[in-house]
């Protein structure tokens, strides 16, 4: 529907040929997604993702909260390097099956996973579709070509694969422990207690099926990720790296049978992206995007530059971050990001604000805003659809009760991170390293406190002194009351 409406609009208003319409599609993004989907599809046949789930249960020692923490961390890490839509496609069936075996409600588990999938995916360029689009649409080459070279002077501020890790990963790390604390509080009843099952039976049923294929495909995936890191040196398009890895993996593992791996590709998702790019270009030709950009730009220009432009930069970052978060929650972060990419360039040039912080504000807002509602991110929709097919529907309200507070919390933390790094620190890498170091020290201290009380690692992450403080306050209040009334403690 997106493809047909977008193409129809372009044809009617601009009378462009089909060849011209295809040039509107960002093939860099399509190629990257296609390559990653093929590789993950091949790896999934090894049984490694099912093995992850069983290992998570073993490490949890029957504790439901420990299982949740392990699953969420695994989901976040996989989402950072495989993209969150693909990760959720792979882990949702495994999680549902594991919940059935342990006699748990799958929906809270699935919601927790997808929330951390969106958080983890925000840390890298390939982790979340909005980041993929930003990395492609706001690369130096893309900026130089945008609107016939209109923004060529901003090309030096374009982003690459490594920039996402350097700029976004520290901010995402700052959200992890608070996110787990909020998750534990929201699901304090569902994620408490233990479930004991026969581990040997689970291992025999959900073990790794093909070690040789896993070794080969894992090595190729490692080379692809290494290629992403080397992109600033090689300048090879990330789409070609991903597609090259996919072709190599198919040749090595499925030389004679290509139908099955290609069936694993989410072709409807790729078609949706293609139509989306055409739609956004048609809006650009009609002047809609410029119209929106002018209003946002006017709101930012209203703020004075201040010393070294800090006041306007801070306002621009926070406005773009929070508008992106709230809008992405209710629109879906993919079309929102596609619309905002050219607007970010327009704001940077028109309001005389550094492009870099605006790019990261858009990326943080779009990715974290996807947690706000069930329709906020494609991964949420995929999870809900698969869960409903398995007989466990996820309602909009149920997701909203957990997702929206998580969005508010993580966006607030990232707001602090962005103000400290870009407004106060001027984007200096030392500020990012300092905040990352403080975060890691805080996590270690938090775990140490919990472990000193005899709690396991997962419980230590969310350990707090509220109950102890409550008991202490009650004890002191009781003594004070007794003293005032003139009665002894025994009486």
Predicted regions and their residues:
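Interfacial loop-to-helix junctions that mark the boundaries of transmembrane helices
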Residues: 18-29, 157-170, 209-212, 231-241, ...
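Membrane-embedded alpha-helical segments and adjacent helix-loop junctions characteristic
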Residues: 15-108, 267-269, 273-351, 355-356
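Juxtamembrane helix-boundary/capping and inter-helix hinge elements in multi-pass membrane proteins
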Residues: 45-48, 58-63, 96-107, 135-162, ...
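Hydrophobic alpha-helical transmembrane segments in multi-pass integral membrane proteins
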Residues: 223-228, 276-294, 411-421
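Juxtamembrane and boundary regions of transmembrane helices in multi-pass small-molecule transporters
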Residues: 104-107, 111, 122-126, 146-212, ...
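Single conserved hydrophobic/aromatic residue that forms the stacking wall/gate
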Residues: 1-7, 11
